[in-house]
Amino acid sequence: MKNEVKTFRLFVRPDEKSRQIADKIRALNERTTHPLVESDDADLVIAIGGDGTFIDAVTSTKFSKNIIYTGIHTGTLGFLQDLCENDIFSLIQYINYEQELKTRKVYTSCVKVYLKDGNTYKFFALNEAIIAGDNYSKITFAEYINDELLQNVTGNGIVVATSTGDTAYSSNANGAIDFSNNCQLVCTLLTPIRNAAYERFITNPIICSRINLVLKPCDNISIIIDGKKKNIDSSMIGRVEVSMTNSYYINKLDIMDYSKVSIIRNKILGY
């Protein structure tokens, strides 16, 4: 990762509030020697909008470890967008005059999709991967921990969330919230069926670093990464592996010292 910021780039959500904040940043930055660029080799990326804008910025720059990412929210405090409009001047001062920027690692999951014809797709997820039936129809799949069968499941699918994304779709599906700050995955089944006709599901596991969650579907499935459905022929998917290790991460600017508890209290509970 680059230790010094010489150039930075803006990713702006297409709404009036976000555009106004971007204009303020451009005006303030005219007095500095750090140019704004549009290339993927910028040292710093500033996402302006919501957490979705941050995810789009990281995805567009291919989860680069050579970039420092930060975000300015235009609504409520986010888990990724932890700066607000009032922090703009301090941010410009910080990136222009600090000798060494304080960063922290935000871990991502790695999703590998193995097709029946031998081809493989690889994706990274900041928030979650959802493996579900086409149009969230009922599916049956086998769930493995590494090479060992854990359970056979019939339901609408499974959400595999990072510790960053476990308060998003995963929590809406009654998934656990991980406060450990460890590199691990929170797995939540989507409306699993439990009756005499189907094998009873066992658990929603939390998968630690360097352990693979392996899913082998019996039906056609869809792969949704951070809210975006991947264009893969669902009838060709033979196996999906999701893992998280210390080598999968992005570098995030760490100016504000918000705890996960305080963000949940502010963003989700509203007090």
Feature locations, PLM:
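ATP/NTP phosphate-donor binding region
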Residues: 1-48, 53-65, 84-104, 113-123
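Solvent-exposed alpha-helices and their adjacent loops that cap or buttress functional pockets
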Residues: 2-3, 37-40, 62-63, 101-105, ...
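Short glycine-rich anion-binding loops that position phosphate/pyrophosphate groups of nucleotides
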Residues: 50-53, 75, 164-167
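Short, acidic/small-residue loops that bind anionic groups at enzyme active sites
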Residues: 65-81
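Catalytic core of DAGKc-family lipid kinases
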Residues: 77-156
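A generic structural signal for short beta-strands and their flanking turns/coil linkers
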Residues: 105-109, 125-127, 137-139, 156-158, ...
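ATP/nucleoside-binding phosphotransfer catalytic cores, i.e., glycine-rich phosphate-binding loops
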Residues: 123, 131, 145, 149-150, ...
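Gly/Ser/Thr-rich active-site loops/lids in small-molecule metabolic enzymes
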Residues: 155-197
